[in-house]
Design a protein with these regions (language model features):
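Conserved beta-propeller blade signature
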Residues: 9-11, 61-63, 120-123, 165-168, ...
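Surface loop/turn motifs at the tips and blade-to-blade linkers of beta-strand repeat domains
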Residues: 31-37, 41-47, 102-107, 147-151, ...
Length: 277
């Protein structure tokens, strides 16, 4: 995940390293690679293992997801097989230089986007097949609500659309066999012990999908590559000047799709910070 702040610094989540900043003059700086340790954790979980996606609040606070505290980036299928909440949402405050965990026990938290009220974030739980909303300011501070649940696939990054709604990448589609396996911990344990990892039950990552949704959890439109010919396993997308750009962690290409009726002048972080208006 990447996001620009008001001063055009680019903040980047790097799996296995933490949160970094790239200044306009291309200087790379480490922002943080740790958070507060869980109070009752036997293992020291203060180090960031898999920083994933981020967005920046109006006051400069950076909210970012850590998909799992137990596994490294290449081991994400193992986290999925374990099927429990190993992830967390973390906040870095540049005013104080401190980092702390705001939510934990999440099922592979992934995409993050500041909501329209400026007081909450929308975030995806990939293995929870859901989109949730967390309030960090205002009268609902600390509350979490479900925006969309029981999605047909596994949600990844979330980004703002030019019409004020949101784009969501679906990294893969669910299957009845894997859904059943997630309700059978004994079966998953035997599979993990006896079957090579490349033969495990796995999400259908041969389908590409992006959906647009609103804050009421309504799906407004969707785009599909059902056979995964051009863009399977879409993990990120960004609307920019009337086009939707598509990327995937295992893809060797960037896709571009013309959006009918989209704002041809829309640049996400220019609008976010009120530039060129």
């Amino acid at each position: 995940g990447m996001a620009f702040d008001r001063a055009d610094n680019l903040y980047v989540c790097i799996g296995g390293m933490g949160l970094y900043r790239i200044t306009p003059d291309r200087k790379v700086e480490k922002v943080t690679d740790e958070t507060n340790r869980s109070l009752y954790s036997v293992n020291d979980d203060s180090r960031l293992r898999l920083a994933d996606d981020l967005d920046i609040a109006d006051d400069g606070r950076i909210f970012f997801s850590e998909a799992t505290v137990r596994y490294e980036m290449h081991e994400w299928p193992v986290d999925g097989l374990e099927a429990r909440g190993n992830g967390r949402i973390i906040c870095y405050n540049p005013a104080t230089g401190t980092t702390h965990t705001v939510l934990r026990g999440l099922k592979f938290p992934n995409g993050i986007c500041i909501a329209s009220d400026g007081q909450s974030i929308l975030f995806a739980e990939t293995f929870g097949c859901s989109i949730k909303r967390y309030w960090f300011d205002g009268p609902k501070t600390g509350k979490v609500e479900t925006v969309m649940d029981n999605l047909p696939g596994y949600p990844d990054n979330i980004n703002l659309a030019s019409d004020g709604n949101y784009w969501l990448a679906m990294v893969g589609m669910r299957s009845p066999a894997l859904d059943l396996a997630w309700r059978m911990p004994g079966f998953r344990k035997r599979m993990g012990k006896r079957v090579p990892i490349d033969e495990w039950l796995f999400p259908n990552i041969n389908t590409g999908c992006v959906i647009k949704f609103n804050e009421r959890g309504e799906v407004l439109e969707s785009f599909w590559d059902l056979q995964g010919v051009n863009h399977p396993m879409i993990t990120s997308m960004r609307e920019h000047r009337g086009y939707l750009y598509l990327g995937g962690i295992s893809n060797n290409r960037i896709g571009r799709y013309k959006l009918d009726g989209a704002d041809p002048n829309f640049i996400q972080y220019d609008r976010r910070w009120g530039k060129n208006q």
